[in-house]
Curated annotation (Swiss-Prot):
UniProt KW Ribosomal protein keyword: no
Active site: H178 (proton acceptor)
Species for this entry: Staphylococcus carnosus (strain TM300)
UniProt protein name: Malate dehydrogenase
GO process terms (BP): lactate metabolic process; tricarboxylic acid cycle
Gene Ontology molecular function: L-lactate dehydrogenase activity; L-malate dehydrogenase (NAD+) activity
Length: 311
């Protein structure tokens, strides 16, 4: 039986951390692809990961390269490549720069890994997922964006800190766009099976929700240079594992909507079942009154999407 293969486009902090997790957990062989001028660092990171194998007890194959031919046969392609917003750069400038990156990357994927599933991480991730979906021509179930698992993990972490309980005992879902309008579902938030509202006052819950929405910015502020990469890489790993192992996990993911939740022609974070085909199903759940903010979140994503050339 052939071993699974995951190609990661972009060998920065998130891409290389993801490569390490995949190799260490023996999920798949990894191709870490960079632009030609950054090929040597990609090769160095790949070699460094391989050299940790004898110590940690894994035998993964990790290749650093700048040649798209090396992604041939990949089961999953993860896109982490793209520019970060710099001082003086408008939102529309960033969107157009990264849309151009998505166009270049998607051409390589279409040529060398046409049967792959694509997971997008590049920001603004909802809009970039939409761009990749349109540019690739792939079926909608094979183009996903990562945000909900990460946002939910942050939410669960902050709840666990407030209650001084195990993070793994907190369950919940965060839907919508990846930003200030994301929607933590309070009706689904449980701590060891107990509803969160029975354990925390509303003002404390509101503070947790706000901190979750600013979770990425909090990390950026603490780091001083760069952004989060451990948790984002872990979130992508969870998605990739669910697909390659056909786990049929119910997790939040960005996917193209065609009527679900009343939305059309938009990529948005919603509950999905992930399995061998990618998004096996979008799960539509009843939202309480305070969760109707999903409409506001979709409007914010539409506003960002309006700056795309391919729409």
């Amino acid at each position: 039986m052939a071993k699974n293969k995951i190609a990661i486009i972009g060998a920065g902090h998130t891409g290389s951390t993801l490569a390490f997790i995949i190799a260490e957990r023996a999920l798949a062989d990894v191709v870490l692809l960079e632009i030609p001028k950054n090929e040597k660092p990609a090769r160095g990171k790949a070699l460094d990961i391989k050299e940790s194998g004898p110590i940690l007890g894994f035998n993964g194959n990790v290749l650093g390269t700048s040649d798209y031919q090396d992604i041939a046969g990949a089961d999953i392609v993860v896109i982490t490549a793209g520019a970060a917003r710099k001082p003086g750069m408008s939102r529309d400038d960033l969107i157009q720069i990264n849309e151009n990156v998505m166009a270049q990357v998607t051409e390589g994927i279409k040529k060398y890994a046409p049967e792959s599933k694509i997971i997008v991480l590049t920001n603004p991730v909802d809009a970039m997922t939409y761009a990749v979906y349109k540019l690739s021509g792939f079926p909608k179930e094979r183009v996903l964006g990562q945000s909900g698992i990460l946002d939910t993990a942050r939410y669960r972490t902050f709840v666990s800190e407030a209650l001084n309980v195990a993070q793994t005992d907190v369950t919940g879902l965060v839907l919508g766009g990846h930003g200030d309008t994301m929607v933590p579902l309070l009706s689904t938030t449980m701590v060891g099976g107990v509803p969160l509202r029975e354990l925390l006052a509303q003002d404390k819950i509101d503070a947790i929700v706000e901190r979750t929405r600013k979770g990425g910015a909090e990390i950026v502020g603490l780091l001083g240079n760069g952004s989060a990469y451990y948790a984002p890489a872990a979130a992508i790993y969870e998605m990739a594992a669910a697909i390659l192992n056909d786990e049929r996990r119910l997790v939040p993911a960005i996917t193209y909507l065609d009527g679900e939740y009343g939305f059309k022609d938009i990529c948005l974070g919603v509950p999905t079942i992930l399995g061998a085909n990618g998004v096996e199903k979008v799960v539509e759940i009843e939202l309480s009154d305070d969760e109707q903010q999903l409409r506001d979140s979709a409007d914010a994503v539409e506003d960002v999407k309006s700056a795309l050339k391919n729409k």
